[in-house]
Amino acid sequence: MKKISVSRWITVWNQSHTNIRTVTPKYRTRTMWLTVPAAVSGERVRLRFSNKEGCTTLRIIQAAVCVNGGGRQPVLFCGKERLVLETGEECYTDEIPLRVEAGQYLSVFAAFRGDVTSGNCIAAHVQCSKDGNFVYAPQTDISRRSFMDSYWGNLPGIPAISGVEVLTDETPEVIVCFGDSITQQSTWTVPLERMLNDNGHPAIVLNAGIGGNRLLLGAPEAALQVFGPAAMERFERDVLGVEGVTAAIFALGTNDIGWIRKPEDIETAGADAVFAGLKSLTAKAHEKGLTVYAATLTPRNGSLDYSPEQEEERLRLNAMIRSAGCFDKVIDFAEAAADAADSGMLALYCDSGDHLHPSALGGQKMARCAKAAMTGSDRQGE
């Protein structure tokens, strides 16, 4: 009997939105050029634009998409070239008839009028033009970044777009990494996708990290909202709302514990409260048929304003995560990244320098740890 293939939308790239009004570059009345890899093949593409966390009206005056630098196809919104989204709104484009093969690259061009204040900063190839609409212009009209900006600006702001989807009959695992800056910075998410696919596990690893994000509470007033809404609040949108999602990695809690300033904060942001939040999200994910991986919190002794009381809560939370039976698997990032002589600190080669965020080498080690937990294999090429 011939097998009938069923096409469905699969997210090949996404980002969780936060307020980016303090992030550079500024896209006011400029054009964005974003290029992302397509991990599946298909005949149609659609994009999702968002102003969920913006504080100004989003105006797109023209957009287009192409494959591997080829001819650009117009992007329409209900048949129209322009889009206006008020604060809190998001929408899909019309379906775009565009053949894409797995391994090719999709480029998205969008010209804005006025400020753009909703987006994020994750690892992706994005460029910002000089003032004007350059949707159909050659690359030479994109603003040239200075040597220093190109060298240091590894995570420039990515405005407005929140998802790229391909209509396909392929069935890869789609894993959403739900976390904070340690996820957002992409040091472990990018190598994890490569390792899983090299290991014979077709997978798309999506980054739903927001820098400074907390599980239980939204951004403190002092953070100018760039730290985003509480993960508990954004879970439906940023995990369950992702087309094709099959699994989630929860890597949250370090900022809840990191904001503990007085004894009474432990009740609302300590290990017990964070673990209860993780259990609640796990139950919701399981209801939707998702596999849930929970990550332990990496060491951070020596980081700014980190106290022995906070470290005690981190250790308690990690012990709860390791011993809990509610998660499908546990990814022990804490063990993978810890210094051999002092488990409360990141290993020297895993430390980016602030004693909190992993280096590129640290991210590689965390990715190997995640791959081992997810596949049962502890060798990168296995």
Each model region followed by its residue ranges:
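N-terminal secretory targeting modules
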Residues: 1-178, 184, 190, 197-201, ...
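Conserved SGNH/GDSL esterase-like catalytic core that processes O-acyl groups on lipids
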Residues: 161-164, 171-279, 303-306, 357
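Surface-exposed acidic, glycine-flexible loop patches that form ligand/cofactor-binding
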Residues: 167, 237-243, 283-284, 377-382
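A cross-domain feature marking catalytic cores of carbohydrate-active enzymes
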Residues: 252, 296-297
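Catalytic His-Asp segment of secreted/periplasmic serine-dependent ester chemistry enzymes
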Residues: 258-260, 297-382
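Surface-exposed amphipathic alpha-helices with a cationic face
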Residues: 278-289
